[in-house]
């Protein structure tokens, strides 16, 4: 029976990714990353077309056909299957539907809020175990599926109970430790999760953002019990050199660049995270968010800031069932896991195509083609799908190596696959 066109496209995308990975991952500097991708610790379901989630939703205003075209191609080249959620115009969100009388919410924020509520509503309505929500300006690395396998292993330190029988994950043991950091290679193996390959006791995985901070410990005066545990992923060939670890070209470098060796990615609980290029929710997380911000809370700011406050326990309530006590460390607290640098990031397209319909990071300085930036770019992403899209679609070379370009020009062998600094 002949393969369907979509099956052929997914197969080709997988072969290209596999070829690139093996070509550039043969040095000892990335051996631990390679081991986690190829060993029994890896979750094979993450290699599917929805990254191990039940669905991938992408929010897109119907008028932004340019963005829909770009995401469609990026997903096809990455072997991903996406489902569209129509964006909402602010004019279509009257005061009477805003929760808690949120009449001071700005116009652009209204439409964004409702679109995200519609995505959460779909997840709850269809009783999905988990789903990934993307915004239509998101970009990612060609090696995304391998990245997600490594992330899943690290995330279980916060989302999966240990074998000890305590019913709590590893992170629960580190509330009083000052900034504990554990290498991903030294993590104990928890029982296999039953609900998602990322663990069973999480609410939100914040995978794409424009900034986050490490959680403070109880010793640092943190009044709410949240684990400061950090899981370090060393020698990650997909992490940019330290000087490029910033949310936009005019920003200061992230503290991560000074705190860890080059090419280290760190997974930890969310703290002060902003922007919602990509986040996953579990069924329990979607229900909590839809209730809290679709019905109960008065909103005065953008959805990403609201979501950040929720993960930071700003909306903590003693109401039974409002959160759980696993990864977060206290009864009634949401479990939000993030990663820095992020795995998804905002793409600034050539010719101003990356301009947001709401607002954008960079204080208005990111205007491609207006003397500020000479060409399109994506913070934090080395082998950008969007920046390599033309070459991957047109196939300008019989050698796959010649198709992929690191946007920071770190070189093919030394910088791309082997983590040049």
Regions found by a protein language model. Give the residues of each.
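An acidic/histidine-cluster motif and surrounding catalytic segment
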Residues: 2-134, 138-421
């Amino acid at each position: 029976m002949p393969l369907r066109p979509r099956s052929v496209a997914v197969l080709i995308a997988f072969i290209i990714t596999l070829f690139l990975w093996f070509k550039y991952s043969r040095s000892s500097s990335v051996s631990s990353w390679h081991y986690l991708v190829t060993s029994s610790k890896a979750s094979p379901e993450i290699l599917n077309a929805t990254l191990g989630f039940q669905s991938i939703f992408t929010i897109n205003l119907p008028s932004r056909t340019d963005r829909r075209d770009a995401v469609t191609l990026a997903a096809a080249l990455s072997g991903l299957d996406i489902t569209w959620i129509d964006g909402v115009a602010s004019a279509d969100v009257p005061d009477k539907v805003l929760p808690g009388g949120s009449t001071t919410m700005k116009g652009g924020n209204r439409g964004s809020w409702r679109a995200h509520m519609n995505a959460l509503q779909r997840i709850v309505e269809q009783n999905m175990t988990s789903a990934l929500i993307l915004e239509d300006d998101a970009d990612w690395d060609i090696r995304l599926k391998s990245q997600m396998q490594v992330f899943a292993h690290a995330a279980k330190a916060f989302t999966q109970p240990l074998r000890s029988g305590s019913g709590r994950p590893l992170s629960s043991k580190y509330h009083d430790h000052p900034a504990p950091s554990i290498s991903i290679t030294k993590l104990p193996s928890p029982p296999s999760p039953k609900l998602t390959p990322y663990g069973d006791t999480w609410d939100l995985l914040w995978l794409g953002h424009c900034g986050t901070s490490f959680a403070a410990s109880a010793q640092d005066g943190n009044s709410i019990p949240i684990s400061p545990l950090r899981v370090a992923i060393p020698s990650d060939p997909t992490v940019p050199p330290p000087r490029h670890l910033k949310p936009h070209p005019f920003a200061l470098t992230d503290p991560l660049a000074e705190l860890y060796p080059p090419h280290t990615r760190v997974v930890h609980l969310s703290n002060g995270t902003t922007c919602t290029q990509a986040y996953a929710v579990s069924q329990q997380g979607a229900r909590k968010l839809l209730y809290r911000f679709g019905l109960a809370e008065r909103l005065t700011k953008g959805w990403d800031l609201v979501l950040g406050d929720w993960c930071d326990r700003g909306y903590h309530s003693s109401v039974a069932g409002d959160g759980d006590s696993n990864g977060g460390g206290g009864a009634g607290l949401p479990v939000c896991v993030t990663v820095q640098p992020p795995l998804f990031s905002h793409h600034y397209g050539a010719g101003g195509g990356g301009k947001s319909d709401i607002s954008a990071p960079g204080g208005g300085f990111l205007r491609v083609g207006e003397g500020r930036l000479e060409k399109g770019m994506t913070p934090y992403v080395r082998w950008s799908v969007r920046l390599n899209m033309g070459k991957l679609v047109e196939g300008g070379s019989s050698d796959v190596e010649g198709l992929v370009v690191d946007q920071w020009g770190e070189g093919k062998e030394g910088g791309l696959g082997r983590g040049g600094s």
